[in-house]
Curated annotation (Swiss-Prot):
Major site of localization recorded for this protein: cytoplasm
Keyword Metal-binding tagged: yes
Name this polypeptide is given: Ribosomal protein uS12 methylthiotransferase RimO
GO CC annotation terms, alphabetical: cytosol
GN (gene name): rimO
Keywords: 4Fe-4S, Cytoplasm, Iron, Iron-sulfur, Metal-binding, S-adenosyl-L-methionine, Transferase
Length: 484
């Protein structure tokens, strides 16, 4: 307990992706071990730590709004995370409501910095730097360099001298994100993430396995493997097939029901990895493929690789091994130079691909990216119209794909039971964005249980399912199918 403050209560607020969730839970473990009390109620906290997102403009606005709302509680407010790392002193200057803006290099001693905030001691705002320059260009040289130079890498125990700090779960969900790696070596022209997340750095397999076993002990049934580019896992460990060998080991951990891989780079997705994900028992046949577009010309301007035909061939390869596999993607429309022909090609690709979930984003300039300086920018109203058109198409296509699953059997991980309405996800559904299963006649199935069900109806991207063997209530079935 601090001599300066008898009360050291902290609330963690997490924005953005699942990678940020992992970072927040490591920060929570750090703070708990150093005597801070973690609470959920921001209004009762002495300090609110906001783990910000700095990915796109809407996410940055959400981060600022959350920081302002935290300030309104009367607590001290500390900004961490990607937006804080990316903008640092600039954010501090424009947002005086934040009592401190801390970058990744502060994470190992966050508890001490929060003590400073409570004591009224000024903390110099984080000064951003290009984190790609902090590790060697050669991937295999990075693990040793990261250890020797004490480079802070979120989700990797921060730095070697503080490694071993326990992660602390912030909810009791049966799903837990597990970080494979941090950073990215790709240079997509529209993306700023590598500049503030740094070069790609894999976690050691034994470290990943150890954390996975701990998560299972905490009640996690599904492990959601996250990184900026999971297909690169192991390239800096002199083993480009490391993920293929890691997956069955993760799936074999006691208490783990399923392992799910996120963020696969299509151009790097090798046949061996496709087979491992599609056929390994305990690994969800689920492919989160970041296509972004399908026009080869647009992809080249994005500094990406692929084409409509190569992407369709990859999808065919997946479905030959696992016909019911879930395949999701994101696409960007209105990229500089995108012609009507490019736009039509993207829509044709989506129609032929029959994806289970599609996120549609309109292009907008991001600070510090190559694409921000491109010519051929489309008017904002044209971009908005294309977003609307592709979104409508995507909604129709994913609803058709969901309807195709009616009559099939799925394994549903129950995640919520709210006033008798039981919901969860099947193997083809990733968390939060890919739809869910509504379980009728659940028969007392509890959160964390896996239930063998038959799909009886669809409602958009969502499925209505009934446990196999449950008595059929024709009126309930009729009502469930009305929205399909």
């Amino acid at each position: 307990m601090s001599a300066e403050h008898s009360s050291r209560r902290v609330a963690m607020v997490t924005l953005g992706c699942a990678r940020n969730e992992v970072d927040s839970e490591e920060l929570a473990g750090n703070l708990h071990q150093r005597g801070w009390d973690l609470i959920d109620d921001e209004s009762s906290a002495d300090v609110v730590v906001v783990n910000t997102c700095g990915f796109v403009e809407s996410a940055k606005k959400d981060s600022v709004d959350t920081l302002l709302a935290a300030s309104d509680t009367g607590a001290k407010v500390v900004a961490v995370g990607c937006m804080a790392e990316r903008y640092g002193a600039e954010l501090a200057e424009h947002l005086p409501e934040a009592d401190a803006v801390l970058g990744f290099d502060h994470y190992g001693n966050l508890a001490e910095r929060l003590d400073d905030v409570l004591a009224g001691r000024a903390i110099q705002p984080h000064q951003p730097q290009d984190r790609r320059k902090m590790l060697p260009i050669t991937p295999v040289a990075r693990p040793a360099a990261a250890a020797a130079s004490e480079v802070a890498v979120p989700g990797h125990g921060w730095v070697p001298s503080t490694r071993g700090i326990a992660r602390r779960r912030l909810d009791d969900s049966p799903l837990a994100a597990l970080k494979l790696a941090s950073g990215c070596d790709r240079r997509c022209s529209f993306c700023a993430i590598p500049s503030f997340r740094g070069s790609f750095l894999s976690r050691q397999p034994e470290e990943v396995l150890g954390e996975a076993a701990w998560l299972a002990e905490q009640g996690a049934k599904e492990l959601f493997l996250v990184s900026e580019n999971s297909t690169s896992y192991g390239k800096d460990l002199s083993d480009p097939r490391a993920l293929e060998t890691l997956l069955p080991r993760l799936a074999g951990i006691d208490g783990v029901d399923r392992v799910r891989v996120s963020y696969l780079q299509p151009a790097e997705t090798r046949p061996g990895l496709v087979r491992a994900i599609a056929t390994t028992p305990g690994v969800a046949p689920y492919f989160d493929l970041s296509f972004q577009h399908s026009s080869e010309k647009v992809l080249r301007r994005m500094r990406r690789f692929g084409s409509t035909e190569s992407f369709l061939a990859l999808i065919e390869q997946i479905r030959e091994l696992a016909p019911e596999a879930g395949i999701r993607s994101n696409v960007i429309v209105g990229f500089p130079g995108e012609t009507e022909e490019d736009f039509e090609e993207l829509q044709d690709f989506l129609t032929r691909a029959r994806l289970d979930a599609v996120g549609v984003f309109g292009y907008s300039d991001e600070d510090g990216t190559e694409a921000a300086g491109f010519d051929g920018k489309l008017d904002a109203d044209v971009v908005a119209a294309r977003v609307e058109q592709v979104s409508a198409l995507a909604d129709e296509l994913v609803a058709q794909r969901a309807e195709d699953r009616v009559g099939t059997e799925v394994r549903v991980l129950v995640e919520r039971d709210e006033d008798g309405e039981v919901t969860g996800r099947a193997e083809h559904q990733g968390p939060e964005v890919d739809g869910e299963c509504v379980v009728v006649d659940a028969g007392g199935a509890g959160v964390g249980e896996v239930v063998h069900c038959r799909v009886i109806a669809s409602e958009g991207v969502d499925l209505v399912v009934r446990p196999v063997g449950a008595a059929q209530d024709s009126s309930q079935l009729r009502g469930a199918g009305e929205g399909s």
